[in-house]
C-alpha cells in the first residue's frame, strides 16, 4: 500500500481549527436535506441512472424524471463510501491520500477559458490553448505546495476540431508526474480516459483500477438536477474504479436560497444524490464531497469567488463532509481580481485560510483570477507562496517542554539575545520563509531592481518552464497513449 507523502498535504486539525457548527446544527442541515431529497426530490435526466435508483427502492416518476431518495439509502451509501483513498501519481513520491479528517492538500483551479499573460510589464488576456495546459502542468509539477493537478483551462484551439476532453486528459498526464484530476469530463468519452490510463500501465486494466493516476469531477445542475453527463461520469467512474468528485456549484440567491444555511441544504442534497448513485452502482466507489458553491451578487449579476461567503461555505462543506465521513474538495484561493494584484492577494489568502482551518482535504483555486474565467501562471507561483504561509498559520503555537524553552531563557538571561544559541541556528527554517514574497528593507529591495511581486513571479515562471524536468513517460507507452487520442479524434470527425 502506498504511504502518505510527507510533503503532500498538511495536518489541519492538530493546530488551529475552525468549527462553524455545533453537532446539533450539522444534524439540522442533514435532516433538512433528507426532507428535500423526498420533496421535491432530484430530477435525474439519465434513464440508466433512474433505473439504478428505482431498482434500489427509490420512487421514480418517469414523466417528470424526478427521483425521491429515502434516508435509509443515503445512510447505506455513506456507510459504503470510503473515508480514505489514494490518488496515485506517475511518480510514487507524489501519491496523496484523500482522507476524512486527514491532511489538507492544494490543487490548481479549473476550468478557465482565458490566460492572463504578463508581457513587458503589462497584462493581456488570450484564449487558452492546449500548450497552456502543458505549461501549467509543468509548473504544478515543480510547485511544492500544489499536491496534484486539476485541469486549469480549456484547450480552446481543439474545440470543434477534435476530441477536446481526450486531449485534455493525455496532455496533463504527459506533463506532470502528479495525479491528474479532470474537471471537465464527457460521460460518453470516459472509456477513452480509462484506455489512456490502461495504456500507461502497459494494458493492465487491474493495475489501472488499483492505482488510478486519473480522477474525474462532475457538477449537478442547481437546483436539484443530475444531468445525463453527470450521471454517466458517476456510473462509469464507479465501474472503472476512477475516483469521482461530486461538486455542487449552487449560487445563493440565484440557484439556491439566499440564506447560506438554506444553500447548504440544496448543495447537500445535490452532492448526496450523486454519492448515492455511485454507491448503488458499485458499493465502495471512491468519491469526494465537493463544493464550488458561492453567492450570487444580486447587484452586479455575477457569482463572486473572492468573497468571505465563499470561504465560509467551503469551510462549512468541509465540516459537512467530516460529519458524513467523506473526503472533501472545496473552492478556495479564489479571487475576482483581473490580474495578480493587491485584491488577488487579499481574497486568495482569506478564501484559502477559512477552509484550511476547517480541515478541507483539497482546496482548489491556485492560479485562478476573474471569477474563475482566467488563469495566470504568475498567480500560481504567488499562490504557492501563500499556501506555505497558510500552512505555518495552521500549525498554531505548539506548547511542550521543548518549545517553552525555559532552559534557553535561563541560559541567555536578562538583556541578552538568542541569536548565538545552537538551538536558534538549528531551527533557522522554523519561521515562515516564503520564496517570492520580499522581506528586505527598502534600500536592499531597490538595489536588487525594485521588482514588484508580479515581475518576480514572472521570472520564476520563465525559469521553471525552461529548466524544470518532469519525469518522462516511456516513449513506446506514450505512443500507445497518443494512439487513443488519435482514435477519439477520428471518432469525433466521423472518420
Swiss-Prot record:
NCBIfam families: trimeth_pyl
EC number: 2.1.1.250
Family in the record: Belongs to the trimethylamine methyltransferase family.
GO terms assigned for molecular function: trimethylamine methyltransferase activity
Pathways involved: One-carbon metabolism; methanogenesis from trimethylamine
GO biological process, one term: methylation
Protein name (database record): Trimethylamine methyltransferase MttB
Organism lineage: Archaea, Methanobacteriati, Methanobacteriota, Stenosarchaea group, Methanomicrobia
Broad EC category: transferase
Catalysed reactions, as listed in the record: Co(I)-[trimethylamine-specific corrinoid protein] + trimethylamine + H(+) = methyl-Co(III)-[trimethylamine-specific corrinoid protein] + dimethylamine
Keywords, comma-separated and alphabetical: Methanogenesis, Methyltransferase, Pyrrolysine, Transferase
Pfam families for the chain: MTTB (PF06253)
